[in-house]
Swiss-Prot record:
It catalyses: phosphoenolpyruvate + UDP-N-acetyl-alpha-D-glucosamine = UDP-N-acetyl-3-O-(1-carboxyvinyl)-alpha-D-glucosamine + phosphate. Its EC number is 2.5.1.7. It comes from Listeria monocytogenes serovar 1/2a (strain ATCC BAA-679 / EGD-e). GO terms for molecular function: UDP-N-acetylglucosamine 1-carboxyvinyltransferase activity. This is UDP-N-acetylglucosamine 1-carboxyvinyltransferase 2. HAMAP family: MurA. The lineage of its organism: Bacteria, Bacillati, Bacillota, Bacilli, Bacillales. It is found in: Cytoplasm. The active site is at 117 (proton donor). GO terms for cellular component: cytoplasm. Its main location: cytoplasm.
Length: 423
């Protein structure tokens, strides 16, 4: 069986969209709970498949997970360092955070190579470099990564590439190491601050999270705590783009505007009216979208995760817009699908040129990854007629209750299951 989203497009939407907790925080906060020696309570977690996969993995390790609505109570007391060869680990890329957490607590881990969205070469060499600097021996045996350490000792680690995953993973491994660790050229994303806040509440000593130099003084023990996750800035940004594309007045609630400066700046440049409050943003109706050029950069630059959704909106803009992805140059698989709907594009190296305005028509399309899926949903809402999106599972990895949320603001969107057919 294959599930599809069916969208009848061309409707103007209005109302309120509620942003959930940050996916990219959740997938690190849940493994971080392994480091504690008593119960950890996480509040505001998103209702997405990656989160449930991590609960299953923690239970495989002997932990207890109770969850209700958006709160998880994780008791890691009886956990053991069991090998995690594949299965659940293969379902999500962020399973690599289990390496840092298990290494930090047990001094050893065996983990199958992680899965998730395929976005071209994205190896974990910086993670491994960090673990080795802390004293771990890392080997790759039969498609699994083996980590072993007699003891972990603080070290000075310079990241050759600014990597959110490596920054968080090294933090997880270093908080219970002996002595001081310094991570230089660290990533500065809000999700890193969120993980550092959780670890600090557990008793870790961390200075400089959110800057390019993070200093950690190792401690022997970490205890449980309560922690509320930050809102998902990528979901918020996606909703802002969707509101600009198809809205006639949409309020987006549970946001931190300072986390959204890149997308706010670009939408303003495109002529999108906005009213920004402390924890909500109102997007007014837009008649004409102005063309823009965008380059993705590491935070606080324009996020690569929003370039695909924005591509769909730019089909409405007058003239030629250029999007350059400096982070993932091959992240343009959605372009071919948008072309099926009548979008006009030209790919040049790591850039896409979007010629507009184009009148999109409903079509059968396939989401190849999470944010491509978001782009196709926005395009489907913009398009005249019926759009059928395959690859729903990609979308649901990162957007919780997307059908319910969009239906509530007037979208005609449903889910349909059919037997496998090739399109």
């Amino acid at each position: 069986m294959t599930d599809r989203l069916i969208i009848q497009g061309g409707k103007k939407l209005s109302g309120t969209l509620q942003v959930d907790g940050a996916k990219n925080s959740a997938v690190a906060l849940i493994p971080a709970a392994i480091l504690a020696e008593s119960e950890v309570v996480l509040e505001g977690l998103p209702d997405i498949s990656d989160v449930y996969t991590l609960y299953d993995i923690l239970e495989e390790l002997g932990g207890s997970v109770r969850y209700d609505n958006k709160t998880a109570i994780i008791d890691p007391t009886d956990m053991l360092s069991m090998p995690l060869p594949s299965g659940n680990v293969k379902k999500l890329r962020a399973s690599y955070y289990l390496m840092g957490a298990m290494l930090g607590r047990f001094k050893k881990a065996v983990i199958g190579l992680p899965g998730g969205c395929y976005l071209g070469p994205r190896p974990i060499d910086q993670h491994i470099k960090g673990f080795e600097a802390l004293g771990a021996k890392v080997t790759n045996e039969q498609g699994a990564i083996y980590l072993r350490a007699d003891e972990l000792k603080g070290a000075r680690i310079y990241l050759d590439v600014v990597s959110v995953g490596a920054t968080i993973n090294i933090m997880l491994a270093a908080v219970r190491a002996k002595g001081k660790t310094v991570i230089e050229n660290a990533a500065k994303e809000p999700e890193i601050i969120d993980v550092a806040t959780l670890l600090t509440n557990m008793g870790a000593i961390i200075k400089g999270a959110g800057t390019d130099t993070i200093r950690i003084t190792g401690v022997d023990h970490l205890h449980g705590c309560h922690h509320t996750i930050i809102p998902d800035r990528i979901e918020a940004g996606t909703f802002m783009v969707l509101a600009a594309a198809s809205g006639k007045g949409i309020r987006i609630e549970n946001v931190i505007p300072t986390h959204l400066e890149g997308i706010i700046a670009k939408l303003t440049e495109m002529g999108v009216p906005m009213d920004i409050e402390e924890d909500s943003i109102f997007i007014g109706e837009v008649e004409n979208i102005k063309k823009v050029d965008i380059k993705t950069y590491a935070y606080p630059g324009f996020p690569t995760d929003l370039q695909q959704p924005l591509t769909a909106l730019l089909t409405r803009a007058e003239g030629s817009s250029v999007i350059t992805d400096t982070i993932y140059p091959s992240r343009f698989k959605h372009i071919a699908e948008l072309e099926r709907m009548g979008g006009k594009f030209k790919l040049e190296g790591r850039s896409a040129v979007i010629s507009g305005p184009a009148k999109l028509q409903g079509s059968k399309v396939t989401a190849t990854d999470l944010r491509a899926g978001a782009a196709l949903v926005i395009a489907g809402l913009l398009a005249e007629g019926r759009t059928e999106i395959h690859g729903v599972e990609h979308i649901e990895r990162g957007y919780s209750k997307i059908i319910e949320k969009l239906s509530a603001i007037g979208a005609d969107i449903t889910r349909s299951s059919t037997a496998e057919t090739n399109i």
